[in-house]
Amino acid sequence: MHNYFLRTLSRLLSLELVERSKESKRRLDEKPLTMLKIGVLGAGHLGKIHLNCLKQIEEYALVGFFDPAGDTAKAVEEETGIRAFASIDALIDAVDVVDIVTPTIRHFECASKALQKRKHVFIEKPIVATPDEANALKKLADEAGVKVQVGHVERFNPAFIAAESFIGEPLFIEAHRLALFNPRGTDVPVVLDLMVHDLDILLTIVKSPVSHISASGVSIVSPTPDITNVRIEFENGAVANLTASRLSMKNMRKTRIFQKGAYIAIDFLDKKTEIFRINDEVDETNPLSATITLADGSERQITFQMPEIHPINAIKTELESFYSAIVHNTTPAVTIDDGINVLKLAYRILDAVAESAAKVKK
């Protein structure tokens, strides 16, 4: 009896060890195969947000950051415990991936140094300061053969993600991006500071070349336009009306999309999406609907839907997506070409604003 008990206990222990081994292997298999070393260039407001997000992503090994302002670098190092490097080159040499969160005017300098050393580059929007810099950066990226992703973060906004599957062929798009005044960002026109977010969304959902642009803008407190409105016409007949202002009494980031049989409202700020659809058949049992009678006597039903919004940190998610693109050798979610196309459209708008201003002066 004693021997039987010992044999049974031994078998049970063996089975438990096997199961533990399987569980351990499963956990190992679930762990990322590659740990990428990453460093951040720029430790200002947005740079600190990136540092905080990267600390939460276990697939990245956050090596450190560089900021040319010594006092800022020291303060951030003491606050976060993340190493402050003494130079850009020292940081780039120590990492696999460079995350560029500097003022736009320094994007090209930082990105070109990283690409020349064949480092993967995540670069905040706008991609660089001018179209000429964008073309030069594209050439460097192609020569380096590495991944580049641009930080057009609204692609990762949960409200847009919830709306995306409902968007077909937009006919009219209206966007308002208004912000309280903040001196940060006034080194560039509001088109490059704020409107670029909506330009990226616009080029994502309208699959047609731009045919005509008319725009106007006003400089009130900074040397460049603080408020701009633009009408963009596409070759497929779609029209967009965009307004961006950094002198508003309240913050607003709303886009409305009108297409055949549907109207989609996206609130990027409050993370809400509303879908209104027109149905030919009337379902009187649907409580979230209203029936309308047209001039010819026919009836249509308008149904209302609010898709579920999955709360995510958009910046953290875009950085995670870049990791995935690198290790799986896939196309980044927001490519260098996407960033260049947005920048070139922004400059066409700036040219239209200047042309409009010249007419007013006459």
Task: Label the model's feature ranges.
Residues 50, 80-138:
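Beta-loop-alpha module in the N-terminal Rossmann-like domain of NAD(P)-dependent dehydrogenases
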Residues 5-9, 32-79, 202, 362:
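N-terminal Rossmann-like dinucleotide-binding module
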Residues 151-158, 181-212, 225-226, 339:
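Mid-domain beta-loop-alpha active-site segment that forms a flexible
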Residues 128-185:
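A contiguous active-site-proximal alpha/beta segment in oxidoreductase catalytic domains
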Residues 90, 97-100, 317-362:
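C-terminal helix-rich "cap/oligomerization" subdomain common to oxidoreductases
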Residues 199-278, 308-330:
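Contiguous beta-strand/loop segments that form the cofactor/metal-binding neighborhood of enzyme cores
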Residues 86, 123-124, 148-150, 174-175, ...:
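Hydrophobic residues in well-ordered beta-strands that form the structural core
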